[in-house]
Amino acid sequence: MISIGCPPLSLLPFEEALQMVDGRFEGWEIIAEGKHLLPAIKEELEEAISSHRMKFTIHAPLSDINIGSLNPGIRKEVLDQLVEVVMIAHQLGVERVTMHPGFLSPITFSRRELAVAAVRDSVEEIERRTKGSGVLKCIENMPVSFMTLFTEPEEILDLTDGTSFMLCLDVGHANTTGNLPEYLQHWRRFGSVHVHDNRGRADEHLPTGEGDIDFRMVLDKLKDFKGDFVIESRSVEEGLASRKYIESLNMTAP
């Protein structure tokens, strides 16, 4: 299944964004921020789920959301929001929520291990508070940046070991960190795959085919993967261009 995840859509009223996506993709990964904060659109989303054949999944809020924060008050608010998203997804029958694994802040730039420990505690708390929800929770690998955590396969796999969390492989992010082939070896641990392109130096979110990622190789390595492919794009039009490129490879994403 090919879905779209398009952050700019979260700045539009939900119904307007839905009309832009409906009938053009099999699924929509809603970015739950801006005008699409899940508590605010819960009723509209429930109606959309019941009246559309499209599959809906959720990308948890990411702006200002840091599960690696050392500030107890901020971290509590972040965890409360993420747990709320998972539980609303459970109530609506949405099967998957994707989250980011936090980032460094001024206090942890020189003590990275403190942020990593906070992330581990956060994952354990989310796991405990959402136990029994039945919602698939995925942690996404991050791109190259002076602020990012969990860019290496062994780090994020170790983070999710012993939990119900799976990995959301972000192909573009892995290209910037130079370890896409290593990530692809662990495809059985993937709950979903994010698709966009870049030239290996920055997280550009280009349409597929405009960067240097070998998507023929990626699709071949993922030929037995049964989860969703989510095209992350800067606009619906670029998302459609990415889909057309993938289909032109004469290889069908699951």
Specify the residue positions occupied by each region the protein language model found:
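N-terminal pre-domain/capping segments
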Residues: 1-84, 90, 166, 252-254
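Histidine-acidic metal/acid-base catalytic patches
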Residues: 1-3, 12-19, 95, 149-157, ...
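Active-site beta-loop-alpha junctions enriched in small/polar residues
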Residues: 7-9, 30-35, 61-63, 102-104, ...
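Soluble or luminal CAZymes and related metallo-dependent hydrolases
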Residues: 13, 37-41, 77-81, 115-122, ...
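Acidic (Asp/Glu)-rich catalytic clusters
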Residues: 17-23, 39-57, 86-93, 127-132, ...
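Generic enzyme active-site microenvironment
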Residues: 27, 57, 138-139, 168, ...
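A short acidic, helix-capping loop that chelates divalent metal ions and anchors anionic groups
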Residues: 64-70, 105-110, 200-206
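Active-site acidic/histidine proton-transfer and metal-coordination neighborhood
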Residues: 72-166
